[in-house]
Amino acid sequence: MDITIHNPLIRRPLFSWLTPSRIFDQIFGEHLQESELLPTSPSLSPFLMRSPFFRMPSWLETGLSEMRLEKDKFSVNLDVKHFSPEELKVKVLGDMIEIHGKHEERQDEHGFIAREFSRKYRIPADVDPLTITSSLSLDGVLTVSAPRKQSDVPERSIPITREEKPAIAGSQRK
């Protein structure tokens, strides 16, 4: 019986921090790339195929979240294209907005899948929680927004005065 012995130094990736070695380091929910389904040569390090450095993460295409604080409004955009409006809940809890989505197991083109997520966003101090609204676009982007309160304090210039003593004791201006 032939047993192949591999030198562990050759099989070990050069940058081990790029390859998950523990279960908590792995990225669950990532799609398998076609290249990962093909057998690799024993002489090639798994680093070349499995490293996140060489893979585009699926969150670049799905699941993006964007919070914007503009001059006159606050908004959150969240990609929820895998959920129907009935499977989504948006609520205000104190100074936080919580968005929760859940759908039970169902079949798709790859097999069966169940999804659930929860995201929280802090409501800015100048936003009235009672004015928050949400809408779902045709392409599956949930938008939660509210107007910002306009400041009652008018803008003014503050003059700068020059002092004759140093701010730091013992230092002198040269």
From Swiss-Prot:
Biased composition (Basic and acidic residues): 149-166
Known tissue expression: Lens as well as other tissues.
Binding-site positions, Zn(2+) 1: H82, H110
Residue positions binding Zn(2+) 2: H103, E105
Membrane-spanning parts: none
InterPro entries: A-crystallin/Hsp20_dom, Alpha-crystallin/HSP_16, Alpha-crystallin/sHSP_animal, Alpha-crystallin_N, HSP20-like_chaperone
Stretches for region Disordered: 148-174
Record domain sHSP: where: 55-163
Pfam families: Crystallin, HSP20
Presence of the UniProt keyword Metal-binding in the record: yes
GO BP: apoptotic process involved in morphogenesis; cellular response to gamma radiation; lens development in camera-type eye; muscle organ development; negative regulation of amyloid fibril formation; negative regulation of apoptotic process; negative regulation of DNA-templated transcription; negative regulation of gene expression
The entry's keywords: Acetylation, Eye lens protein, Metal-binding, Zinc
CC terms in the record's Gene Ontology section: cytoplasm; cytosol; mitochondrion; nucleus; plasma membrane; protein-containing complex; Z disc
Entry-linked Gene3D superfamilies: 2.60.40.790
Repressor in keyword set: no
Residue positions where N-acetylmethionine is found in the record: M1
GO molecular function: amyloid-beta binding; metal ion binding; protein homodimerization activity; protein-containing complex binding; structural constituent of eye lens; unfolded protein binding
Family: Belongs to the small heat shock protein (HSP20) family.
Function: May contribute to the transparency and refractive index of the lens.
Assembly behavior: Heteromer composed of three CRYAA and one CRYAB subunits. Aggregates with homologous proteins, including the small heat shock protein HSPB1, to form large heteromeric complexes. Inter-subunit bridging via zinc ions enhances stability, which is crucial as there is no protein turn over in the lens.
Protein name: Alpha-crystallin B chain
